[in-house]
Protein backbone atom coordinates (compact mmCIF):
# COMPACT_ATOMS: atom_id res chain seq x y z
CA UNK A 1 0.00 0.00 0.00
CA UNK A 2 1.32 3.42 -0.90
CA UNK A 3 2.08 5.77 1.98
CA UNK A 4 0.25 9.07 2.03
CA UNK A 5 2.66 11.74 0.85
CA UNK A 6 3.24 14.65 3.19
CA UNK A 7 5.62 17.43 2.20
CA UNK A 8 8.82 17.38 4.26
CA UNK A 9 9.62 20.61 6.08
CA UNK A 10 12.63 22.56 4.88
CA UNK A 11 15.12 23.05 7.67
CA UNK A 12 17.98 25.53 7.66
CA UNK A 13 21.25 23.90 8.71
CA UNK A 14 22.04 24.46 12.36
CA UNK A 15 18.68 26.07 13.14
CA UNK A 16 17.77 25.90 16.82
CA UNK A 17 14.26 25.32 18.17
CA UNK A 18 12.43 28.38 19.48
CA UNK A 19 10.12 26.35 21.79
CA UNK A 20 11.14 24.28 24.80
CA UNK A 21 11.19 20.49 24.51
CA UNK A 22 7.90 19.78 26.37
CA UNK A 23 6.02 22.22 24.13
CA UNK A 24 7.46 20.68 20.98
CA UNK A 25 6.67 17.15 22.14
CA UNK A 26 3.10 18.10 23.03
CA UNK A 27 2.59 19.59 19.57
CA UNK A 28 3.93 16.46 17.89
CA UNK A 29 1.89 14.14 20.11
CA UNK A 30 -1.29 16.00 19.19
CA UNK A 31 -0.53 15.50 15.49
CA UNK A 32 0.28 11.82 16.03
CA UNK A 33 -2.98 11.27 17.93
CA UNK A 34 -5.01 12.96 15.20
CA UNK A 35 -3.76 10.46 12.60
CA UNK A 36 -3.26 7.32 14.73
CA UNK A 37 -6.47 5.60 13.62
CA UNK A 38 -5.75 6.24 9.93
CA UNK A 39 -2.15 5.03 10.30
CA UNK A 40 -3.34 1.83 11.96
CA UNK A 41 -6.24 1.06 9.63
CA UNK A 42 -4.19 1.63 6.46
CA UNK A 43 -0.96 0.13 7.88
CA UNK A 44 0.86 3.20 6.61
CA UNK A 45 3.86 5.17 7.80
CA UNK A 46 2.85 7.99 10.21
CA UNK A 47 3.97 10.68 7.79
CA UNK A 48 2.14 13.57 9.44
CA UNK A 49 3.65 12.83 12.84
CA UNK A 50 7.16 12.63 11.43
CA UNK A 51 6.64 15.80 9.46
CA UNK A 52 5.95 17.44 12.84
CA UNK A 53 8.88 15.64 14.52
CA UNK A 54 11.23 16.87 11.82
CA UNK A 55 9.85 20.41 11.85
CA UNK A 56 10.34 20.59 15.63
CA UNK A 57 13.81 19.07 15.43
CA UNK A 58 13.31 16.10 17.74
CA UNK A 59 15.38 13.55 15.81
CA UNK A 60 18.75 14.80 17.08
CA UNK A 61 17.84 15.78 20.63
CA UNK A 62 20.29 13.42 22.36
CA UNK A 63 23.27 14.27 20.14
CA UNK A 64 25.81 16.48 21.98
CA UNK A 65 25.44 20.21 21.49
CA UNK A 66 28.93 20.35 19.97
CA UNK A 67 27.61 18.25 17.07
CA UNK A 68 24.39 20.21 16.59
CA UNK A 69 22.08 18.39 18.98
CA UNK A 70 20.63 19.32 22.35
CA UNK A 71 22.49 16.89 24.63
CA UNK A 72 19.29 15.46 26.11
CA UNK A 73 19.73 12.42 28.38
CA UNK A 74 18.04 9.04 28.13
CA UNK A 75 15.49 9.95 30.80
CA UNK A 76 14.13 12.80 28.69
CA UNK A 77 14.27 10.72 25.51
CA UNK A 78 12.30 7.99 27.28
CA UNK A 79 9.67 10.52 28.32
CA UNK A 80 9.28 11.63 24.68
CA UNK A 81 8.78 7.97 23.74
CA UNK A 82 6.18 7.64 26.51
CA UNK A 83 4.22 10.66 25.32
CA UNK A 84 4.35 9.61 21.67
CA UNK A 85 3.32 6.09 22.68
CA UNK A 86 0.21 7.51 24.30
CA UNK A 87 -0.67 9.26 21.05
CA UNK A 88 0.23 6.56 18.49
CA UNK A 89 2.08 3.33 19.20
CA UNK A 90 3.69 3.17 15.76
CA UNK A 91 4.96 6.75 15.96
CA UNK A 92 6.40 6.15 19.42
CA UNK A 93 8.10 2.91 18.38
CA UNK A 94 9.67 4.40 15.24
CA UNK A 95 10.98 7.35 17.26
CA UNK A 96 12.38 4.95 19.87
CA UNK A 97 14.12 2.77 17.27
CA UNK A 98 15.71 5.84 15.69
CA UNK A 99 16.98 7.10 19.04
CA UNK A 100 18.43 3.67 19.93
CA UNK A 101 20.61 3.73 16.82
CA UNK A 102 21.62 7.35 17.35
CA UNK A 103 22.73 6.40 20.87
CA UNK A 104 24.81 3.48 19.57
CA UNK A 105 26.68 5.72 17.12
CA UNK A 106 27.00 8.63 19.54
CA UNK A 107 28.35 6.55 22.44
CA UNK A 108 30.74 4.34 20.47
CA UNK A 109 32.09 6.39 17.55
CA UNK A 110 35.21 7.53 19.41
CA UNK A 111 37.15 10.16 17.47
CA UNK A 112 35.93 8.91 14.08
CA UNK A 113 35.52 12.12 12.04
CA UNK A 114 33.28 10.45 9.43
CA UNK A 115 30.77 9.39 12.06
CA UNK A 116 30.91 12.79 13.74
CA UNK A 117 30.06 14.41 10.40
CA UNK A 118 27.15 12.01 9.99
CA UNK A 119 25.73 13.04 13.36
CA UNK A 120 26.14 16.71 12.45
CA UNK A 121 24.24 16.07 9.24
CA UNK A 122 21.57 14.10 11.10
CA UNK A 123 20.94 17.09 13.36
CA UNK A 124 21.10 19.70 10.61
CA UNK A 125 18.84 17.82 8.18
CA UNK A 126 16.84 15.87 10.78
CA UNK A 127 17.63 12.53 9.19
CA UNK A 128 15.64 9.46 10.21
CA UNK A 129 17.70 6.30 10.86
CA UNK A 130 16.41 2.72 10.72
CA UNK A 131 17.91 -0.44 12.19
CA UNK A 132 18.82 -3.70 10.50
CA UNK A 133 19.70 -6.26 13.16
CA UNK A 134 17.54 -9.29 12.29
CA UNK A 135 18.71 -11.51 9.47
CA UNK A 136 17.84 -14.72 7.66
CA UNK A 137 17.04 -17.67 9.89
CA UNK A 138 18.51 -15.97 12.96
CA UNK A 139 15.36 -13.99 13.61
CA UNK A 140 15.60 -12.20 16.92
CA UNK A 141 19.12 -13.45 17.72
CA UNK A 142 20.84 -10.15 17.05
CA UNK A 143 24.15 -11.42 18.47
CA UNK A 144 24.66 -13.52 15.36
CA UNK A 145 25.25 -12.27 11.81
CA UNK A 146 25.42 -14.24 8.58
CA UNK A 147 26.45 -11.55 6.08
CA UNK A 148 30.09 -10.39 6.30
CA UNK A 149 31.61 -7.01 5.57
CA UNK A 150 33.82 -7.30 2.48
CA UNK A 151 36.84 -4.97 2.56
CA UNK A 152 38.24 -3.63 -0.72
CA UNK A 153 41.74 -2.35 -1.39
CA UNK A 154 40.51 1.20 -1.99
CA UNK A 155 39.32 1.60 1.60
CA UNK A 156 35.69 0.88 0.84
CA UNK A 157 33.45 -1.93 2.00
CA UNK A 158 30.53 -3.84 0.54
CA UNK A 159 27.76 -5.70 2.33
CA UNK A 160 24.78 -7.75 1.22
CA UNK A 161 22.38 -9.12 3.81
CA UNK A 162 18.87 -10.52 3.80
CA UNK A 163 17.12 -8.62 6.57
CA UNK A 164 13.93 -10.28 7.74
CA UNK A 165 12.79 -6.93 9.18
CA UNK A 166 13.83 -3.33 8.65
CA UNK A 167 11.18 -1.23 10.33
CA UNK A 168 10.27 1.87 8.27
CA UNK A 169 13.16 0.97 5.94
CA UNK A 170 11.46 2.51 2.91
CA UNK A 171 11.01 5.78 4.82
CA UNK A 172 14.47 6.07 6.38
CA UNK A 173 17.34 8.37 5.43
CA UNK A 174 19.88 5.86 6.67
CA UNK A 175 20.34 2.40 8.17
CA UNK A 176 22.53 1.20 11.02
CA UNK A 177 23.18 -2.51 10.55
CA UNK A 178 25.00 -5.36 12.21
CA UNK A 179 27.32 -7.54 10.13
CA UNK A 180 30.01 -10.17 10.53
CA UNK A 181 33.40 -8.50 10.85
CA UNK A 182 34.81 -10.45 7.87
CA UNK A 183 34.10 -13.54 5.80
CA UNK A 184 36.32 -15.69 8.02
CA UNK A 185 34.93 -14.30 11.29
CA UNK A 186 32.60 -16.14 13.64
CA UNK A 187 28.92 -15.27 13.46
CA UNK A 188 29.18 -13.58 16.86
CA UNK A 189 32.20 -11.46 15.83
CA UNK A 190 30.14 -8.50 14.69
CA UNK A 191 30.51 -4.84 13.79
CA UNK A 192 27.98 -2.03 13.47
CA UNK A 193 27.91 -0.21 10.14
CA UNK A 194 26.30 3.20 9.53
CA UNK A 195 24.86 3.80 6.08
CA UNK A 196 23.22 6.81 4.47
CA UNK A 197 20.59 6.43 1.78
CA UNK A 198 23.10 6.98 -1.02
CA UNK A 199 25.17 4.04 0.28
CA UNK A 200 22.62 1.26 -0.17
CA UNK A 201 19.65 -0.17 -2.03
CA UNK A 202 16.72 -2.09 -0.58
CA UNK A 203 14.91 -4.85 -2.47
CA UNK A 204 11.64 -5.79 -0.82
CA UNK A 205 11.33 -9.43 0.26
CA UNK A 206 8.11 -9.39 2.28
CA UNK A 207 5.42 -6.98 3.37
CA UNK A 208 3.97 -6.04 6.74
CA UNK A 209 0.35 -6.99 7.35
CA UNK A 210 0.52 -7.40 11.11
CA UNK A 211 -1.84 -7.50 14.07
CA UNK A 212 -0.49 -4.28 15.57
CA UNK A 213 2.27 -1.68 15.24
CA UNK A 214 1.03 -1.53 11.67
CA UNK A 215 2.47 1.89 10.96
CA UNK A 216 6.04 0.75 11.59
CA UNK A 217 6.01 -0.81 8.09
CA UNK A 218 8.45 -3.49 9.26
CA UNK A 219 9.04 -5.12 5.91
CA UNK A 220 11.83 -7.50 4.92
CA UNK A 221 14.54 -6.47 2.46
CA UNK A 222 17.74 -7.47 0.79
CA UNK A 223 20.16 -4.70 1.69
CA UNK A 224 23.10 -4.10 -0.67
CA UNK A 225 25.60 -1.48 0.45
CA UNK A 226 28.86 0.12 -0.65
CA UNK A 227 30.44 2.59 1.76
CA UNK A 228 33.64 3.86 3.30
CA UNK A 229 35.34 1.61 5.85
CA UNK A 230 35.24 4.65 8.15
CA UNK A 231 31.50 4.09 8.47
CA UNK A 232 32.13 1.04 10.65
CA UNK A 233 32.00 1.86 14.34
CA UNK A 234 35.44 1.29 15.88
CA UNK A 235 34.21 -0.72 18.89
CA UNK A 236 33.20 -4.38 18.60
CA UNK A 237 29.45 -4.83 18.47
CA UNK A 238 29.70 -7.06 21.54
CA UNK A 239 30.50 -3.96 23.62
CA UNK A 240 27.92 -1.77 21.88
CA UNK A 241 25.26 -4.42 22.41
CA UNK A 242 25.79 -4.76 26.17
CA UNK A 243 26.48 -1.12 27.01
CA UNK A 244 24.05 0.75 24.77
CA UNK A 245 21.96 -1.27 22.32
CA UNK A 246 20.18 -3.50 24.84
CA UNK A 247 19.72 -0.92 27.63
CA UNK A 248 18.44 1.78 25.27
CA UNK A 249 16.20 -0.67 23.42
CA UNK A 250 14.60 -2.15 26.51
CA UNK A 251 14.14 1.21 28.22
CA UNK A 252 12.84 3.13 25.19
CA UNK A 253 10.62 0.29 23.96
CA UNK A 254 9.33 -0.03 27.52
CA UNK A 255 8.54 3.67 27.55
CA UNK A 256 6.45 3.33 24.39
CA UNK A 257 4.56 0.32 25.77
CA UNK A 258 3.96 2.20 29.02
CA UNK A 259 2.57 5.10 26.99
CA UNK A 260 0.18 2.76 25.19
CA UNK A 261 -0.93 1.33 28.54
CA UNK A 262 -1.43 4.83 29.96
CA UNK A 263 -3.57 5.83 26.99
CA UNK A 264 -5.74 2.73 27.37
CA UNK A 265 -6.13 3.42 31.10
CA UNK A 266 -7.17 7.00 30.33
CA UNK A 267 -9.80 5.62 27.94
CA UNK A 268 -11.11 3.38 30.70
CA UNK A 269 -11.21 6.28 33.15
CA UNK A 270 -13.19 8.39 30.69
CA UNK A 271 -15.63 5.53 30.11
CA UNK A 272 -16.22 4.94 33.84
CA UNK A 273 -16.68 8.66 34.51
CA UNK A 274 -19.16 9.00 31.67
CA UNK A 275 -21.10 5.95 32.83
CA UNK A 276 -21.28 7.44 36.33
CA UNK A 277 -22.61 10.72 35.01
CA UNK A 278 -25.24 9.05 32.86
CA UNK A 279 -26.36 6.25 35.17
CA UNK A 280 -25.55 7.52 38.63
CA UNK A 281 -23.59 4.39 39.58
CA UNK A 282 -20.36 2.63 38.76
CA UNK A 283 -20.49 0.37 35.68
CA UNK A 284 -19.79 -3.37 36.18
CA UNK A 285 -16.26 -3.05 34.81
CA UNK A 286 -15.18 -0.26 37.19
CA UNK A 287 -12.99 -2.58 39.35
CA UNK A 288 -10.99 -3.38 36.22
CA UNK A 289 -10.13 0.30 35.88
CA UNK A 290 -8.70 0.17 39.41
CA UNK A 291 -6.61 -2.84 38.40
CA UNK A 292 -5.43 -1.06 35.24
CA UNK A 293 -4.36 1.91 37.33
CA UNK A 294 -2.52 -0.34 39.77
CA UNK A 295 -0.59 -2.26 37.10
CA UNK A 296 0.21 0.99 35.30
CA UNK A 297 1.70 2.44 38.47
CA UNK A 298 3.78 -0.70 38.98
CA UNK A 299 4.96 -0.50 35.38
CA UNK A 300 5.87 3.19 35.60
CA UNK A 301 7.71 2.66 38.88
CA UNK A 302 9.74 -0.27 37.55
CA UNK A 303 10.64 1.58 34.36
CA UNK A 304 11.72 4.79 36.08
CA UNK A 305 13.82 2.77 38.55
CA UNK A 306 15.56 0.95 35.69
CA UNK A 307 16.19 4.26 33.91
CA UNK A 308 17.73 5.66 37.08
CA UNK A 309 19.93 2.57 37.53
CA UNK A 310 21.17 2.82 33.96
CA UNK A 311 21.87 6.54 34.22
CA UNK A 312 23.99 5.83 37.31
CA UNK A 313 26.23 3.28 35.59
CA UNK A 314 25.95 4.01 31.86
CA UNK A 315 29.59 5.17 31.64
CA UNK A 316 30.97 2.32 33.77
CA UNK A 317 31.79 -0.62 31.44
CA UNK A 318 32.48 -2.96 34.35
CA UNK A 319 29.10 -2.30 35.97
CA UNK A 320 27.29 -2.60 32.64
CA UNK A 321 28.89 -5.99 31.99
CA UNK A 322 27.99 -7.29 35.46
CA UNK A 323 25.34 -9.95 35.99
CA UNK A 324 23.28 -7.68 38.24
CA UNK A 325 22.81 -5.01 35.59
CA UNK A 326 22.40 -7.43 32.69
CA UNK A 327 19.69 -9.26 34.65
CA UNK A 328 17.99 -5.98 35.58
CA UNK A 329 17.83 -4.68 32.02
CA UNK A 330 16.67 -8.02 30.58
CA UNK A 331 13.95 -8.47 33.18
CA UNK A 332 12.87 -4.86 32.65
CA UNK A 333 11.96 -5.70 29.07
CA UNK A 334 10.10 -8.87 30.01
CA UNK A 335 8.18 -7.28 32.87
CA UNK A 336 7.41 -4.05 30.98
CA UNK A 337 5.98 -5.95 28.02
CA UNK A 338 3.82 -8.20 30.18
CA UNK A 339 2.64 -5.49 32.59
CA UNK A 340 1.73 -3.22 29.68
CA UNK A 341 -0.36 -5.97 28.08
CA UNK A 342 -2.06 -6.71 31.42
CA UNK A 343 -2.86 -3.03 31.90
CA UNK A 344 -4.46 -2.74 28.48
CA UNK A 345 -6.52 -5.89 29.09
CA UNK A 346 -7.79 -4.45 32.37
CA UNK A 347 -8.71 -1.24 30.54
CA UNK A 348 -10.57 -3.23 27.88
CA UNK A 349 -12.57 -5.09 30.52
CA UNK A 350 -13.34 -1.82 32.28
CA UNK A 351 -14.88 -0.45 29.09
CA UNK A 352 -16.69 -3.69 28.24
CA UNK A 353 -18.28 -3.82 24.81
CA UNK A 354 -17.51 -0.13 24.25
CA UNK A 355 -13.82 -0.95 24.53
CA UNK A 356 -14.16 -4.02 22.34
CA UNK A 357 -15.81 -2.21 19.45
CA UNK A 358 -13.60 -0.57 16.83
CA UNK A 359 -16.20 2.13 16.14
CA UNK A 360 -16.51 3.32 19.74
CA UNK A 361 -14.95 6.48 21.16
CA UNK A 362 -13.71 4.25 24.02
CA UNK A 363 -12.20 1.59 21.74
CA UNK A 364 -9.16 -0.21 23.15
CA UNK A 365 -8.61 -2.31 20.02
CA UNK A 366 -5.61 -0.44 18.62
CA UNK A 367 -3.96 -0.24 22.04
CA UNK A 368 -4.36 -3.98 22.58
CA UNK A 369 -3.08 -4.96 19.14
CA UNK A 370 -0.09 -2.61 19.44
CA UNK A 371 0.90 -3.71 22.94
CA UNK A 372 0.71 -7.40 22.03
CA UNK A 373 3.83 -6.82 19.94
CA UNK A 374 5.78 -6.23 23.16
CA UNK A 375 6.35 -9.84 24.32
CA UNK A 376 7.49 -10.92 20.83
CA UNK A 377 9.85 -8.02 20.03
CA UNK A 378 12.86 -10.14 20.97
CA UNK A 379 10.77 -12.97 22.37
CA UNK A 380 10.44 -12.97 26.14
CA UNK A 381 11.07 -16.71 26.26
CA UNK A 382 14.39 -16.22 24.46
CA UNK A 383 15.41 -13.57 27.00
CA UNK A 384 14.41 -15.70 29.99
CA UNK A 385 16.13 -18.79 28.57
CA UNK A 386 19.35 -16.82 28.09
CA UNK A 387 19.14 -15.68 31.72
CA UNK A 388 18.36 -19.08 33.21
CA UNK A 389 21.93 -20.39 33.55
CA UNK A 390 23.67 -17.16 34.67
CA UNK A 391 21.14 -16.45 37.43
CA UNK A 392 20.95 -20.05 38.64
CA UNK A 393 23.92 -19.56 40.97
CA UNK A 394 22.98 -16.04 42.07
CA UNK A 395 22.33 -15.70 45.82
CA UNK A 396 18.87 -14.80 47.02
CA UNK A 397 18.56 -11.42 48.74
CA UNK A 398 18.72 -11.85 52.51
CA UNK A 399 17.11 -8.49 53.22
CA UNK A 400 14.57 -6.16 51.64
CA UNK A 401 17.37 -3.61 51.43
CA UNK A 402 19.89 -5.84 49.61
Residue map of PLM features:
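Generic structural signal for well-ordered, non-transmembrane alpha-helical segments
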Residues: 26, 259, 290-297, 330, ...
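A short core secondary-structure module
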Residues: 165-202
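Glycine-rich flavin
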Residues: 47-55, 60-167
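Glycine-rich beta->alpha junctions and the first turn(s) of the following alpha-helix
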Residues: 208-300
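C-terminal helix-coil-helix/basic helical segment that borders enzyme active sites and/or dimer interfaces
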Residues: 33, 37-40, 298-335, 348-358
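Alpha-helical scaffold segments that form or flank carboxylate-/histidine-based iron centers
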Residues: 247-253, 281-292, 324-335, 363-372
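Glycine-rich phosphate/pyrophosphate-binding beta-alpha loops
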Residues: 164-169, 249-252, 377-378
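Glycine-rich phosphate/cofactor-binding loops in nucleotide/flavin-utilizing enzymes
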Residues: 353-402
Amino acid sequence: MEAQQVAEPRLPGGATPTEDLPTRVKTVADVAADHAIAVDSAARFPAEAFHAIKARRLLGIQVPKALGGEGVGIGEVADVCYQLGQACGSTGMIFAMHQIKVACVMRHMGENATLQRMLRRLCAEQLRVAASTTEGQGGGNIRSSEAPVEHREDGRITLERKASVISYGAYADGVVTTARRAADAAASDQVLVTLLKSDYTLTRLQGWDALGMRGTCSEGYTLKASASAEQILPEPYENIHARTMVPFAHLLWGSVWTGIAASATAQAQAFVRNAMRRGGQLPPGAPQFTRALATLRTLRGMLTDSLRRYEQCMNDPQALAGLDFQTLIAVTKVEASELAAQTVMHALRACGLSGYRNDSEYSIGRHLRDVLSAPVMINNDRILANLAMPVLMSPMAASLHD
